[in-house]
């Protein structure tokens, strides 16, 4: 009986040890996978809007067949790339804010709006893993720069304010007198179904 109990304790100990390793490395592996996936998406998106030596834009039809059937097929609904140098952030923007969209990138809450003209709301998950998705969004401060690259142009926005609202206060997405970028994520991080939203608003400063 004692032998069986000892074996059971050892088995339980092994299980707990394995679980410990799983939780220790899971977040790191998840971040590595997401980073690799984003690199592929960004590379594919930029190939659509890049310029050849002759100065003409490279069209999707000119990209290799293997790319069109692989990476480029993942770009359905892609609107551009959001870069935030201050927090080492770079992800692809997709139409909509469904769970599927937010699982692979940043969601454009109202796809009918135009970047550089309207107040464009971009939603992202607040991951608990450092540096993943909008995890570090709360670090942004006044005058920090956000960049959105589309196939048509590159837009630079300057952060003008950060604040917290209730998740029902959708007025933050209303158009203003000037083009805005409004980043939206849950807060605080790590809380299940939080009622508050962290908002970062930035004004357009350049378009090229």
Language model feature labels by segment:
Residues 1-6:
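N-terminal Lys/Arg-rich, disordered targeting/topogenic segments
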Residues 10-208:
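Solvent-exposed, non-transmembrane regions of membrane-associated and secreted proteins
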